[in-house]
């Protein structure tokens, strides 16, 4: 375009005329020559300009290429510099947080006030999923290098500012469960988690997704991983004591035990009846349970068989007698065909016979060769008879050994029937009976005469055995309150009965105070010394048909015990004059 525009300008007539007139003044050459030279110069100049332009264009093209190359390099470098930002933007776009968690359904409860107000729900929605209570879920860990946390949703709440929170009951992975002495608890299965009663509150947005957790008892086989994928729980982790317990242990608190039972039942409903472990596995498991429980449960020591020690130390006095039984008592039991065949039971029978022998009557004409002869300590037994024999002489009806053997055998049979399964309790009961029958003559007499049945004696407390009386009999023998109190002639202000007695005399302050109590209605009140200075003490009940005798008795204060008798009587008379109502007799 430039080139064509220049040729057009040179070929115009106006351009030709102007340079001619100017050249005439400077050159003397002819117009034709000058015109030819000028055209030639212009042509050369135009070609030179054209070549320069072409060269400039080539240079510009080269420069443009270099600039483009440099620009491309700069662009690449700029792209390299801007790539991290672009990647971060892309990551941010990929990690764009979903909508906040929101409750589902109506609220079920509201707790707290003010800033601490919480609204409770049964469900919440987050990231397109709905989560309910009692559902195990995976939670985002604090550190990305950690595995997701596992918890059961126990509560769903919404704070006053609208934030959703969940209360989770946590599971512990074996590498997270610390031991008290250091280190972590180990597991033989990578699926295993440890259940705990530790709870904590976290934002609802930390929930990743649901998961499956199976609670398998210790005596059941684990479900196959292929058929039932998910976590398994066989033990409970104590976050305080840093110990592990079995799911099947029954030492938890009632509420915690019910919680575990419900979780195990849910698992059994899903998996069905799992097969039991083999016997070897069960033995190993029981050993582990015993080792773990030694630290917190009282060790149950098996009862010691005392028979071995006692039977070994005691020798039979005769070749045919039982171990630990004297020849006399063995012969008596053999005569009455009362031997049981059990050495220990026969020994207990012999001791019971010996315990009641001191109240039995042994005829004087008994010969040394009789089966029921008295042993070497006969003189001692006779002395005991004299000491314990009652005044009415009823001991003579307890002939030895006829009156003793049937009752003693019945008592031992009743003890063995009720305590045969527990040798320790049976042995203790026999020792208690032998001791009390020896030291309480009333108990022995009531056993032999049939007043107390063997079953009744077995159920008597140590105090009752010592007294020889049951609780009902002891209550009947206790005197009434009226028998223990001094009855007065004062009339009760509540029931208007003349059954008021003096319960107590209280010494306090300036004078004595007397506590009066009505036997009929139980009403109690206090009276001053002046009011009760002269009281009527009711004597023993008279015979039927005779009038009651009233005796006036002057009650003196404990402070006046040291005063002369005349002075004390004078004081009481003056008090009676001042208070005539107190000295009145009932009509």
UniProtKB/Swiss-Prot annotation:
Basic and acidic residues: bias regions: 560-570
One GO location term (cellular component): nucleus
Biased composition annotated in UniProt, kind: Acidic residues: 66-98
Chief localisation class: nucleus
Segments for region (Disordered): 1-118, 371-396, 539-587
Listed Pfam families: BAH (PF01426), TFIIS_M (PF07500)
Site, as annotated: Histone H3 lysine 27 trimethylation (H3K27me3) binding: 140, 142, 149, 170, 172, 198, 200, 240
Domain BAH: 129-248
Localization, UniProt: Nucleus
Sequence ranges of Polar residues compositional bias: 571-581
Keywords for the protein's UniProt record, in alphabetical order: Nucleus, Repressor, Transcription, Transcription regulation
One biological process term in Gene Ontology: DNA-templated transcription
InterPro entries, per the entry: BAH_dom, BAH_sf, TFIIS_cen_dom, TFIIS_cen_dom_sf
All residue ranges annotated as the TFIIS central domain in the record: 344-493
Presence of keyword Cell cycle: no
Tissue expression remark: Expressed ubiquitously.
Domain notes: The BAH domain (129-248) recognizes specifically histone H3 lysine 27 trimethylation (H3K27me3) hallmarks, binding affinity being proportional to H3K27 methylation level.
Subunit composition and interactions: Interacts with MOM1. Component of the ASI1-AIPP1-EDM2 (AAE) RNA regulatory complex composed of at least AIPP1/EDM3, ASI1 and EDM2 and may contain CPL2, AIPP2 and AIPP3/BDT1. Part of the BAH-PHD bivalent histone reader complex that contains AIPP2, PAIPP2 and AIPP3/BDT1; the BAH-PHD module associates with CPL2 to form the BAH-PHD-CPL2 complex (BPC) for transcriptional repression. Binds directly to CPL2, PHD1, PAIPP2/PHD2, AIPP2/PHD3, PHD4, PHD5 and PHD6.
The protein's role, per its UniProt record: Transcriptional repressor. Together with PHD finger-containing proteins (e.g. PHD1, PAIPP2/PHD2, AIPP2/PHD3, PHD4, PHD5 and PHD6), cooperates to form a BAH-PHD bivalent histone reader complex able to read histone H3 lysine 27 trimethylation (H3K27me3) and low-methylated H3K4 histone marks in order to regulate transcription, especially to prevent early flowering; H3K27me3 reader of this complex.
Name recorded for this polypeptide: ASI1-immunoprecipitated protein 3
Phylogenetic placement of the source organism: Eukaryota, Viridiplantae, Streptophyta, Embryophyta, Tracheophyta
